[in-house]
Amino acid sequence: MSIKSFFTLSASATLVAGMSLFVATIPTEMPQSLKVGKVENEGEHEHRSIEGAIRSVYSMRLNEVTGTIEPEWVEEAIVQADAIRLTRRANKPLKWEEMGPDNVGGRIRAFLIHRDSGNIWFAGGVSGGLFRSVSSGNSWSPINDRQENLNVTCIAQTVSGTIFYGTGEGGFVNLSGTRNGSPAFLGAGLYKSTDGRGVSFTKMTNTSAASFMQCNSMVAHPKEDKFYLGTEDGIYEFTNNGGTQKKISVGSIKELKIDKNGVLWASTGSGSILKMDGAGAMKQMNASVNTGGRTSLAISPEDPNYVYLMGASGTGAFSGLLRTTDGGATWTKLVSYSSITDIFGSNRQGWYDNVVSVDPTNKNLVYMGGVDLATWDNVNGYRETANTFDAAWNTG
């Protein structure tokens, strides 16, 4: 597909590409989402939990009295690290040249095509920062590789042309205990560009609190000069070019989507679905559409009454593709779990690889991304279009 709107929908949520550099900040405390469950048997393989090791690392960094690390500590550590680098550079003036490879990516969670200049693209990696292209993706240049935080997770552009991006991930980790580890790191709030083309970005000082260190999703209102941010702390509405913020919902928010009329949808960390009502409040959908785990959302650009949900269970297994054709009043399960539709694989990576997108000109055609790639339409049903081989799990 070459249609710009579809590319924006699908590429902006893709979890399989990114950047190769890595900067991480220190969490203020050991998040509940990073705790690893008890040891479980998966077939003939037994996996050991690393919760003890994680606790040990955290305990060495915490305040002995409060048991936490204050956000200010992170800022101070960044300043000290920069000073050390400058001192070492002055003493040993070495010149480095990048030798490559330069075509290896990691994981992109933020993607944006400039609303007024289609050749200007932005891509944000969870460990490499924000990159910009003025050639429709043929070449890229880093924007923020010297800024405070390179954990870019979401990006949006308002109708006024201002571009905002958020940092820090909200604990994407397999909670079952059968796959140890977590890729999530805290961020440093929001950044914005007001030059009209996204050449430079500055930190928004009103987002330095811990509430803005885990920015999971961001969408701009299609008609009004405002945007919404979904964090581990809730949903925030930003107006006045980002200068004014209002919390409109609480809880862990994993994904936000907004339709062409400005109606906001959200999914929570526990699989609940929220929709904005006429008064601007977020209301929970019927419990029957709760998938139990991470859920991705897609709204048809053609018809906002058509909304799709692709869910993962609490263990990360595929729990189904659901659709409403009446704006959420009723729901139908289009695809159920089976050995054929197991799009998240035997590793149950629905907590990690989970994206769904609607074709911009066909509200009955959706693209489903997990470990594998599939489509669903009202004529052919579920069809797998690409997959990965299911290699044996290395327990060593």
Question: Residue ranges of each PLM-predicted region?
Answer:
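Extracellular glycan-interacting surfaces
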Residues: I3-G396
